[in-house]
């Protein structure tokens, strides 16, 4: 298990857990690992960008200093979305990209996320190599003086290149659909109006005025309450909410109901399949996707492949087996015909394209998708990794699954960050589902609960 890197880069409270000193080390050590295979005399090139958090510039300058110290040429993109940086790394033929963002997390947090030359997140092995250098007793990396140092160049025109790329994936103007868009006061705030206007969309925006402190503050993909009200108030056909770095998209239908990533993938996937464009008739999701998603796909003779939690694992599965649509319930949707990572703005526009092409409202497109009631309980435990060694827990899970008789599912997994065991079930009614979870939770608490 890695010490600094989580499922989405290095994260922490800015200036406390994630300090400028740490950012410098990540720039120096990470930059070296990513570019050490360059031929002699060929200078490595790395793109650096950030979201709108007040701590972003502090960390950016420290990170860039680390990169420059090992002779790397830095292209400073400024504020842009995470998928925007991923695209630009490939488009510019850069050796790597580094985004400073904590995505949907509150403003106190920040993160540093690395991308390879392919625009994809790093492998666990490469992240481990960076960590070894960070923890080394002595810094033995090159320290050029004068001629061998790196330089910084502004690349703020990168935003325009990225927006043009997204616009080119839409074959026609998206007029006739009124949309309200929530930018989460994040990285997409300055981009939304330019992109959606160029695509002919009738739209209004909310939460697109970042001040460094208001990113994700009761807005964006994890807080859609105000967007839901605004869609109904304005009589709009659709609402779109992005998170702080706009790699997620959550929608709102014309009735003000939230539409998560499962539902968005179902709508887009069904349309692609109908036109023979869904590869292998399969959508890749994580184990967190609702059972109703799989049941809805089965009605259309489509398949669902599931991975462990994390969009990187969805992406790996898609690349390994040639699938072109996948994502997470949380709103990461990967449309690999266009992009190799989740992109909120791209997803939103393609959802609109399906609505326009079919002439149907979002609620009509989802009429055959019935969510199964879900219950999730987080149980504090003494050792989350050893839960499978407790036979009574395995037995009660098997008993519950037998009682479900194929009309429900159980998912038990340890938390990635806390000493918790997450017990989740889905079933035909909320009452039955709650009872299933309660049966399992009681055994978990008896076997390994902190209060047993």
UniProtKB/Swiss-Prot annotation:
UniProt-annotated catalytic positions: 103 (phosphoserine intermediate)
Keyword Thylakoid found: no
UniProt catalytic activity: alpha-D-glucosamine 1-phosphate = D-glucosamine 6-phosphate
Pfam families according to UniProt: PGM_PMM_I (PF02878), PGM_PMM_II (PF02879), PGM_PMM_III (PF02880), PGM_PMM_IV (PF00408)
Required co-factors: Mg(2+)
Keyword Phosphoprotein: yes
One GO BP annotation of this record: carbohydrate metabolic process
Residue numbers carrying Phosphoserine: 103
Molecular function via GO: magnesium ion binding; phosphoglucosamine mutase activity; phosphomannomutase activity
InterPro entries: A-D-PHexomutase_a/b/a-I, A-D-PHexomutase_a/b/a-I/II/III, A-D-PHexomutase_a/b/a-II, A-D-PHexomutase_a/b/a-III, A-D-PHexomutase_C, A-D-PHexomutase_C_sf, A-D-PHexomutase_CS, Alpha-D-phosphohexomutase_SF
GO terms under cellular component: cytosol
Keywords (A to Z) from UniProt: Isomerase, Magnesium, Metal-binding, Phosphoprotein
Positions of Mg(2+) binding: 103, 243, 245, 247
Note describing how the cofactor binds: Binds 1 Mg(2+) ion per subunit.
EC code(s) of this entry: 5.4.2.10
Post-translational modification: Activated by phosphorylation.
Family assignment from sequence similarity: Belongs to the phosphohexose mutase family.
HAMAP family in the record: GlmM_B
PANTHER family from the UniProt entry: PHOSPHOGLUCOMUTASE (ALPHA-D-GLUCOSE-1,6-BISPHOSPHATE-DEPENDENT), PHOSPHOHEXOSE MUTASE
Role description: Catalyzes the conversion of glucosamine-6-phosphate to glucosamine-1-phosphate.
NCBIfam families: glmM
Designated name of the protein: Phosphoglucosamine mutase
Lineage per the UniProt record: Bacteria, Bacillati, Bacillota, Bacilli, Lactobacillales
Gene that this polypeptide is encoded by: glmM
């Amino acid at each position: 298990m890695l010490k600094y890197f989580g499922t989405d880069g290095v994260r922490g409270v800015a200036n406390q857990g994630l300090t400028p000193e740490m950012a410098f080390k990540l720039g120096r050590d990470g930059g070296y690992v990513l570019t050490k295979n360059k031929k002699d005399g060929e200078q490595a090139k790395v793109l650096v960008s950030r979201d709108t958090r007040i701590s972003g510039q502090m960390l950016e300058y420290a990170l860039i200093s680390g990169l420059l110290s090992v002779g790397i040429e830095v292209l400073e993109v400024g504020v842009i979305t995470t998928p925007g940086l991923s695209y630009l790394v490939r488009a510019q033929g850069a050796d790597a990209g580094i985004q400073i963002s904590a995505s949907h997390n509150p403003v106190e947090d920040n993160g540093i996320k690395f991308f390879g030359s392919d625009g994809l997140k790093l492998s666990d092995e490469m992240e481990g190599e960076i960590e070894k250098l960070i923890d080394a007793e002595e810094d033995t990396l090159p320290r050029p003086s004068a001629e061998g140092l790196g330089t910084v160049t502004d690349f703020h025109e990168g935003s325009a290149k990225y927006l043009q790329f997204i616009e080119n994936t839409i074959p026609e103007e998206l007029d006739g659909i009124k949309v309200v868009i929530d930018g989460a006061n994040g990285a997409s705030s300055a981009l939304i109006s330019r992109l959606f206007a160029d695509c002919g969309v009738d739209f209004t925006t909310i939460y697109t005025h970042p001040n460094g402190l208001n990113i994700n503050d009761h807005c964006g993909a994890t807080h859609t309450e105000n967007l839901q009200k605004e869609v109904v108030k304005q009589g709009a056909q659709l609402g779109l909410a992005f998170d702080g770095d706009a790699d997620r998209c959550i929608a709102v239908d014309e009735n003000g109901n939230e539409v998560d990533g499962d539902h968005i993938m179902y709508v887009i996937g069904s349309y692609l399949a109908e036109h023979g464009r869904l590869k292998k008739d399969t959508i890749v999701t994580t184990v967190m996707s609702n059972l109703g998603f799989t049941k809805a796909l089965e009605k259309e003779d489509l398949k669902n492949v599931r991975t462990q939690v994390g969009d990187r694992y969805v992406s790996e599965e898609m690349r390994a087996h040639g699938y072109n649509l996948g994502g997470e319930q949380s709103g990461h949707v990967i449309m690999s015909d266009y992009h190799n990572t989740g992109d909120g703005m791209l997803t939103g526009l393609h959802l609109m394209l399906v609505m326009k092409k079919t002439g149907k409202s979002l609620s009509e497109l989802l009429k055959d998708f019935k969510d199964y009631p879900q219950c999730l309980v987080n149980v504090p435990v003494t050792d989350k990794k050893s839960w499978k060694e407790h036979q009574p827990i395995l037995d009660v899970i098997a008993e519950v699954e037998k009682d479900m008789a194929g009309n429900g599912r159980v998912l038990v997994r340890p938390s990635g960050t806390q000493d918790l065991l997450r017990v989740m079930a889905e079933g035909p009614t909320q009452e039955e589902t709650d009872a299933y979870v309660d049966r399992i939770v009681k055994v978990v608490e008896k076997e390994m609960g902190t209060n047993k």
